[in-house]
Curated annotation (Swiss-Prot):
Pathway in which this enzyme or protein is active: Glycan metabolism; amoeba cellulose biosynthesis
Native species: Dictyostelium discoideum (Social amoeba)
Basic residues biased stretches: 204-219
UniProt: substrate binding residues: D624, D626
Start and end residues of each stretch annotated as Catalytic subdomain A: 328-628
Transmembrane region(s): 246-266, 280-300, 306-323, 790-810, 813-833, 963-983, 993-1013, 1035-1055
Entry keyword Glycosyltransferase: yes
Name of this protein: Cellulose synthase catalytic subunit A [UDP-forming]
Topology of the protein relative to the lipid bilayer: Multi-pass membrane protein
Stretch list, region Disordered: 1-159, 174-220, 933-953
Amino acid sequence: MDRNEGGDFPINTPNNINSSGGSYNNSMNNSSNNIGRDIGNNQSSRNLKPKPSQSNLKWIARDLKKKSVRKDSERKLKSSGVLKKKNTVMDFGEDDGGSGDDGNITEGLPISEGMDDLPSSSNSRGGSGNDEQKKQFPKEMNSPSSEYGTTSGGQRFDTLVDPDISLAEMEEKMRQHKVYQEQQQQQQQQQQQQKQKDKELSSQKKKPSSMQLSKKKHVAKEDSETLETIIGEEKKEVVFEVKPYFSHAILQATMAVFLIWNIFYFAYRAGWTMNRTDYITFSYSILFIIVEFISFLGSALHLNNFTNPCTFVLVVTLEQILAKRRKKHPTVMMYVCTYKEPPSIVSRTFRTAISMDYPSENLWIGLLDDSVNYRESRGWAHLQSVEKNFLYVLLQKAVYSVHNIRPPVTSQHEDPHGILNETSSKIESSTKEVIEAEVQWFIEYFLLNSWFGVGQEIPRDADDAERALIAKLRDDNFSPYRTFTKSESEKISNFTIDSLQSLWHGSAFFRPLIRSILLKKDYVRNFVSELNNQHRLRFLNTEALAMAQYQVLMMGRQELPWDEISSGNVRIDFDTCDGPIVSPKCTYLRRRKPPIPHNKAGNINNALFNESTKADYEFLGLLDADQQPHPDFLKRVLPYFYSDEGQDLAFVQTPQFFSNIYPVDDPLGHRNMEFYGPVMEGRSANNACPFVGTNAIFRRQPLYDIGGIMYNSVTEDMYTGMKLQVSGYKSWYHNEVLVVGTAPVDLKETLEQRKRWAQGAVEIFSLTPWGYIRGKLGWRKMLYNLDSCIYPFLSPTAFFYGASPLIMSIWTVPIVVKDPIIFILVGMIPVMVLPRVIQYMILRAKRPYEAGKSGPSLWVEATDLWRAEQTFFGFAGTYISSWREGSASIVKLLKARKISRHKLAMWNWKRDFVKKPVVCEVFRQTKLVNENDNAQESSGKHKAEQSFRTSNKESDTIKNSRLFLPNIILFVVNILAMMSAVLRFNCFQNDMWLLVVVAGFSFSTLWHLWSFIPMALRQSEKQWPYASSYHAHNIVLFLVLGFLVLLFVDVKVCIPRVG
């Protein structure tokens, strides 16, 4: 019987205080009756008063012996910490909240007489006297009165004197219990002292910054409960596992061999060079040693990323975590950033983002349109695509809620061959296609022609207030940088058809608002009804239209809390009305750019600080306009944030994957699998994953704490990731393809992109105090970030290697020695072979497989190793040209700030906040724009508000043709070097091995530049049809055959030796 209910108590319960019918009755009845009477004041139960029996006396001797043996065994187990039970008399110090449900302490004992009404265990838990019992319990157990059973009325049942033991035994047990408590206290004190020492040691190693201290203050909040406080588990919840996929011992041993062998190689080279008497050979050899040493440092710095190759494997899903913690799905804002992408690409990305598998009420999609002028047609197209996609999802959900199109489920005996199920699934898929077609058709018709059936409305005249509001809204100086008040929104919803048409033709940004009003009109439903009567529509009916009601809120501000990133905003919110159908909230945001717009960083910070508050969302996702997320993108990334109790995790990065690029058809190296594979995984294992600008989920608070996306660099993404690491935050990498994008396929756009990346690396390298970064992050993380910034400065080595074959073939200047065996053993193996062996071992290592993945992990192909070397030669000229732009931007910034480079770098990295803008919950009413601003905007002299000019392909080709020249020059130089080496091979027998090395060196350079030259000469907007990199193998074969022919044919073409 349930103890919470009234009724009989079972015999063997702790609430039944038993006594024997013999000599124990007189000593125990008083105490048991007193306790039973005191506790029974608040509760009631049936009395158990069995009649005394003389046979009960026979149990005493046997039961005393049995009970003493049982208690001794339990005492030993309990003192060793193996057994913790509350159903023994030994459990004096257990505190279970005053519960009477402590198990059986009277098993095998006779039933005493004279028992009063006893309380139920369920009602004794919540009594007011429980706290007093907890406080008085230890004292009463040590008091002499407890030994004789003269405890107070608030005493618990398990503190009663056991009638089966004597007074001396009770004293001995009390002494043992006291000793046990003292031992436990001593152990706890020792543990606390050890923890205090560990904290002091860790604080001495790394002192927390002021941002870390302030960050830990708002960690302990009511809404940030940990797993222990909710379900009472002591074991920490495991969300993911870090699994290494390559042996660290083998990897470190191979790197040690690489370093030691290179030291011997450079020592041998230096000794050989110092013994040269030829001035040309000596000078060239010194220069070659310097270039090789720089390459060695770059290789060692790059191999540092591979020291800890691990992959993160999720072991729980987001739903399981939220179910355990009893929490709801967090609110996520997904920002899609666009600048000059075509509206079709932006619309496709927005459609996939709004269709993600996530609760609609917790998902918010925002399109950040950073086009140059708000009057431009591109901005209107972006706004229309936002409305179209929002309405599409809303109508689709409404249709599915009205029509049940799920196929019937048949049992196996009814459909043993699966024919009925297969037919039902086909019917369901065809039905979904019809629904999507009908919804798409209606949206296109409704957006293009929203005035059908106007004659069905009853005409009425507009009043004076309506005309005044129309004139106010049509004022170009007042809209759309303004906020609608509640009264204005109500007036607009009640406008006449003539007023709505007047507003429709006044400004294109008011059309979404007018369409949301028109959709509620009766003639729209009548139009759909007519179509249904004519059998033109099957699923889209008036009931679905009634459920798919949405509202549009026009907001914009001329005065902004943070005016450095915007001088005015246009914001249009699409939200569903109160009803059963909920679609993700959508927002279109456009800013009026200030004189220094800060590009993408300013666009994101405007949305973060000026157009959102802390209560709006907890997590922030960033997507580029051409990156389409997987439906499970959020479900696969958000679990990482729940494994971080201290909220030190700032963001989780996912890889970039391009649908128009394949492993063998990637001549420009867009896949970059080496970086998105072991490099990112190795850094993530040390909590230092870089931010690549897109496909990442941020926690809003860390990004807000550092002042948003960083400025002073065109690669603001890498700068922001470094700033978060310096501020004490962690960043992880989830190697699963969850976002698919498109990459530039022509050489011109690729070179522009790589030049911008290299310029940003130069700016970050110049504005970073590396000593300060090393003190904050340590050597390893500092080298991670240095490797991301130093690669443009290694590009001159590629030019030197490219020009060396021609120099050596003309002047016959040796590299090391003329003996090929020594050159291969001492030079080729440490410099060229060992780094490739290390990379190949790591790149081709087998990754741990994770069940339930939504996308594949990036698998590194064999050609990716060659792509890394290919891009090193192919983009060398582009990287060198970025020095000038990066240095010029730094000099311009220093002149504008009137501060030294070191002071600017220290200020930029030490500050905890760029600026603290205060964002109001309610948007303020804007004022009229100043006449000076209007005149400046109309004149077109404002730099940030110039009209967008489409790119002129001819002018862009002429402007960027200088980026193609280094590749073409290197290609021609190496062709000449190979021809010279082939001809001299038959003339100078003493230099034959040197010429073989020269020919191989020049061939390697030509191989790396092979895919760039046709694209540079053709200037095509499409990808060069470069079928496979393995075509180079055929070229090697023909060259080897040519060498063999020259060896056996008696033809010698001698060229006089220069010098």
